[in-house]
Structure formats: structure tokens, C-alpha cells
Amino acid sequence: MKKFFLIAVVLLMMINFIINYHHEVTKEKHTPMADFKTKVEMAPMKEYNDPDFGYVVKYPCFFQQEDTSVSGCQGYARFSFTNHANIILESYVTPNYSNTLQACADSLAQKLHSERTIQASNKAFILSGPVYENGVRVDGYSHYDKFIKSGRILFVYSLTYPDSYKPAMPRLFKLIDDWKVLGAY
């Protein structure tokens, strides 16, 4: 009887350990960032067609398209995810005052405090780095932007995200890397 009781106690302790261990492992996997990563990797993409400049951007279907009509800016669109984190995709058109692509990239890298410049092609480049607002670093946020030069204008597709969510961003980085504007090349 003592052996049975001892075996039962040991068995119950093992079962309790397994249940608690499984609960902790499962809890770690279901962080908001991990949930976002799964969601963004599986999400179908929607398309936004800009009525003013004709460019197209894709964005995850669970992002909300914001009303940008009050901004007064032509060629501007904004898509956001604000559940546990603020993740913003923006597309816009801006004047290009530089004569060369490199001069344009250097000027914008300095203005945006970007840490690196990647030339995506002979008409496009990517800037990334910490986010600054009015010259002050926005703690914990970074940007990843693609600029496509077309004559005297730049088409821009931009991602702003929390640094803690960077492991969940590869699909959005690729979305921006692969973005093209018809007629700009």
C-alpha cells in the first residue's frame, strides 16, 4: 500500500510538472508580437490604388485604411495596426530636389537620421533607422522606407514599427523591398 501511495504521489507530481511546463511554453508562444507575426505571415494582401498618381501598394488585410482626405495631401495613404502595438504603413509622393539618386539618398538619410542606405536599383533606395520627431528620438520605434525616383518626384512606401516587433517584420520588409511603381523605372 505504501508503494502504491508513493507511486501515485510521484505520478501526480510528474503530471503536475508536465501540465505547468506545457502552460509556460504555450504562454511564451502567445505573446502579442508572436500573434502579430503569425497573423502577418498568413494574411491575404489588399491593394490600394492611388487615384492621383496611379501607384499601387499592398498591405495586410487586417490593417485599417485611415481616412487621409483631411490631410490635404495628394497621393497619401495610411494603413495601421493598433492592437497591442502601433504599426503604420504609409505611401505618399513628395518632390525630389536632388539631381542624382545618391544625392537624394544622402540628403534624406541625414534628414531621417537613417543608419543605413541600401540602393535597391538605379532608381530606388531604402532607408532605415530609428524614428525621430521634431529632432527627438521616438524611443523604441524604427522606420523602413523605400523611395522610388521618377523625374522630379519620389514615390515613398514607409513602415514604422516598434523595435520589439522587428522579428515579426520580414514579410512587411519584403513587401516594401519588392514594391515597384509602373512607369517610374
Give the role of each language-model region.
Residues E66-K174, Y185:
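Conserved polar/disulfide-associated segments of primarily extracytoplasmic proteins
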Residues F5-N20:
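Hydrophobic membrane-insertion alpha-helices, especially the h-region
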